[in-house]
Amino acid sequence: MRHLLYATRQTYETAILIKEAALLPSEIERNYIDPITISGYSKENLIVFTLDYQPNNKAPVGHCKAYLLGQLLPALKKLGTKFIYCADSNYFKVLTKNTKAEAQLGYVLPCAIDGYTDMKVILGVNYQALTYNPNQADKLNLSIGTLTSQLSGQYKALGSDIIKWASYPKTEAEIEKAFAEIMTWDEIAVDTETFSLHPLKAGLGTIAFSKDITGGFGFQCDLIQQEGENVRIFNTMFRHRLRKFFEEYNGKVIWHRAAYDLKVMIYNLYMADPLDNAGLLEGLEVFTKNLDDTLLIAYLATNSTAGNELGLKTLAHEFAGHWAKDDISNILAIPLPELLQYNVVDTMSTMYVKNKYYPIMVRDGQKRIYQEQFLPSLKTIIQIELSGLPLIPDKVKEARKELENGMFAAIQLMRGTKFVKAAERVIQQRAMEAANAKLKTKQHPIEHFSHMQLNPGSNQQVAILLYEVMKLPIIERTKTKQPSAAADTIDKLIYHAKTQESKALLQALIDYNKVAKILSSFIPAFEAAFDKGNGRAYLHGNFNLGGTLSGRLSSSDPNLQNLPSGSKFGKLVKKCFAAPHGWIFAGADFNALEDRINALLTQDPNKIKVFTDGYDPHSMRTYAYWPEKFKHLPNTVEGINRIQEEFKTERSDSKPVSFALQYLGTWMTLVKNCGFSPEESKRIEDNFHKLYEVSGKWVKGKIEQATKDGYGTGAFGLRIRTPLLAKSVLGSSKTLREAEAEGRSLGNAISGQSYGLLTNRAVNEFMQRVWASKFRNDIIPVALIHDAIYVLIRNNPAAVKFANDNLIECMAWKGLPEIADPRVPLPANLDLYWPNWATPITLENNLSEDEIKQAVTAALEARKAA
C-alpha cells in the first residue's frame, strides 16, 4: 500500500484512492492536488493511497473487500479521514454498495461498510482515462468540483435545485392557458412518457414542454390517477388539443431521440389504424417541419474513435444528476406527480444538451451535414419504422422448425466424431473431480457422470474441445485471457484444421452457432411482430442515426444488419418476408458501393481497372497474391479472369485475405484468420501492398494528417475525432497500440464505410419525389440494410416503373467532388421479391411498363421451366 504525503501530521481529512499504476506524483498534483488547493483547501490535509489489483489487472468484489477491510479502511480510520475521493469504479461500488458507479458521479455518498459509515465517498476519475478519451475531462472536473464543494460546506446534490418553476395543468381552462403561453415561445423542448417502447403500443402517458433549463409544463394525456393508482385511459379531448397545438406552432421543436417520440406522436394523433399511410404522412409533415434532435446534435459534436454516450441522462448528468433511479419501464408504477416532474426534467435536460452541444457542432463544421443529411434521414426513418417489414407468421413457424432440425443435425454430427467423444470424457472427468473434492469419504465413480454431453453453447466446454482435444492454435483470447471459443473465432479456426474430420466438425460448430444466433436473436422478434390484420405481421425495428463511428446506420430490436444472407440459413429467413396482397416487396442494393467509393477516393489505378477494364476483382487479387501459381496465365483481362472458372479454390482462398488486408490488417491477421504460415502471410501482404500501392499511400496520408488535426473527415464532411492519434507519432516504438487501432478505425471509415451515407441520401431524395407524386400512398419505405433500400410498392405497373426509374437515378448520384470521376459509376438494379424476399426478379434500368410486365412474366416462366 503506497502513499503520497504533502505534510507529516497525525491526521489527514481527505484521502485520494487510485490504482498504483497511476501513482505518478507530478500527474497526481496536476490533476487532483492543484485543482483542490485552488479552491482554498490546504494540501496538507490530503493523502493519496494506492488501490490493490490482482496480477491480471482485475479487482473483483471479494478482492476489493479484503483490501479495504484488511488494510486501507483501518488505516484511514486511524488517520481521522472523513472524505474519500475514489478514482476507481470497482472500489467505489464496494465502498458505497452501489451496482452502478457512473450514475453517482457528482454525488457525496456515505460509506456503506459497517464501522466506517461516518466517512463520505465521492466517485472520482482516474486521470489516465483522459489519454484514451478526452471527454472524460468533464467528468474529472465534475468529480473534483463535488469534492471541493463538500470540503467548503457548499455541496448540493446534482439536480436538487434545477426546477425554478413548473406547472401541471389539469382543467380544460388551465390546459388552454398553458398552451397559449407555450405558443408564444420561440423554441420548445418536448418529451413524452409512454406505456411501451413499441411505437404502436406506446400510447401517450404524459408530455412535457420547456423553453429553457429553468422549468416547464407537464400534462397528463392517457394517464389519470384513481384512488391513488395510475390508470391508462384514452383521452380524446387532450389528444385533439395536442394535435391542434403542433399544427399551429411554427417555432423550433426540440426532441432527444426524435425517431421514437415522433413515431408515438404520429401514430397516436394521426393514424386511424396501423396501415394508415395517409395519416402517417400528414403527421410526418407536421412534426418534421421545424425540429432539432439533440441526440444527433450530440453525436455530431462528439463522434470519436474513443466512443461517445448519447443517452439523455448521460449527456445531461452534470446538469440534472441522476434524476431517475432507473430507466422507467412501467409508468403505471410511478406516482403521477413524480412522473410529471420527471418528464419536465427531461425537457429541461434536452434544452441543456442543445445549449451545450449545438455550438460545438457548429464550431466543428457539422451543421451542414446535420441539416442536409441527418434531419432528412430522420424524416425518412420515421416512416420506415412506423411502416415495418411484412412477415408471414406461418413461414416463421416453418423456419423455426427447420432451424431446430438443423441445430439437432449439427449436434448429432459433432457427437459422432472422436474429438467430441474425447472432449466429453474430459468434461465428465472434471465434473467428477469437482464433485468428489466436496466429499470427505464417499467418492463418485466416473460412471455417475456419463450422462454429461458436450454443450455447443458453452464456451468453456467448446474451448476444451478446440484447444485441449483438437490441439488447435490459440489465436484469440477473452477479456479474462482465456482461449476464445466465440463464434467468430471458430470461423477463423477452420482455416487451421488439418484433416477433413476436424474441418467437418468445425463446420458443424459454425452451422450450430449461426442457427443458434437466428433462433435467439431473430425468430423471437419475428414471432412478436405486430399483426395488422391483412395477413401479415410487421417487424418494427430501429434504424439508428448516430450509432456508428462512420455515420452508417446501425440497427436494433432486432439488428437487421446481422440478418444472415448468402447461405442456406439466409434464404430460410428471407422466405418469411413477403408483401401483403396487392403489394410487391422490392429493393435495390448498390453494386459494390464500398469498393467503388474506395477506387474513386484513392484513384488507385488497379482498383479503377476493375470497373473500366472488366477485371474480376477476386481473380485480380488472387493473381497478385500467388503469382507463382499463375505464371502460365497471360497478364491480361482475359487471362486473369480465367481464374474465376479454372481456379475456384484459390479464388475462394483470396476472399478472407482481401477482407483482412482491405481493413488494414497485417500478415499476422492472415496467420490468425486464414491459417497461412508467417512466411506465406508476409509474401501475400507484400503483394497486396504492391498491387494497391496508391490506395495504401492515400490511407496512410489521411491517418498521418489526423495526427496533426486530431480528426479525419468522412462522407459529407462528417468529422471523426481521433484523440489518440492527435497525441501520437505513428511508426515509432512508443506508439500506443490503441493509437494504431484508432488509425485502422479511421482509415476504414474514411476510405469507404462513411459513404454508406449515400444510401441515406438516395432514399431521402427518392422519398421526396414519392411524397410529391401521385404514388405517395403506393410506395412505402420499409428498411435500410447495409447499402440496400427496401420498399413496398402497390401492385401497379406505373408505380413499379416510377420506383425503377427514380430510385435507381437517386442511387446513381455522384454530387460529391471526391467521387465525381465518371469512369466509376454507382449502379443499382431494382429487385421485385416474388413470392418472397428469397426469390428476386431483377429489373433492368429504365424499363417501360410493358417491358416490366414482360420481364416479370419471363422470369416466372423461367422458374417453372427450371
Language-model features: where?
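Conserved "right-hand" nucleotidyltransferase catalytic core of DNA-directed polymerases
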Residues: 149-227, 275, 307, 319, ...
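Short hydrophobic beta-strand that contains or immediately precedes a catalytic carboxylate
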Residues: 16-18, 124, 188-190, 291-292, ...
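Short hydrophobic/aromatic beta-strand micro-patches
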Residues: 790-794
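Conserved catalytic core of nucleic-acid polymerases
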Residues: 379-386, 407, 439, 540, ...
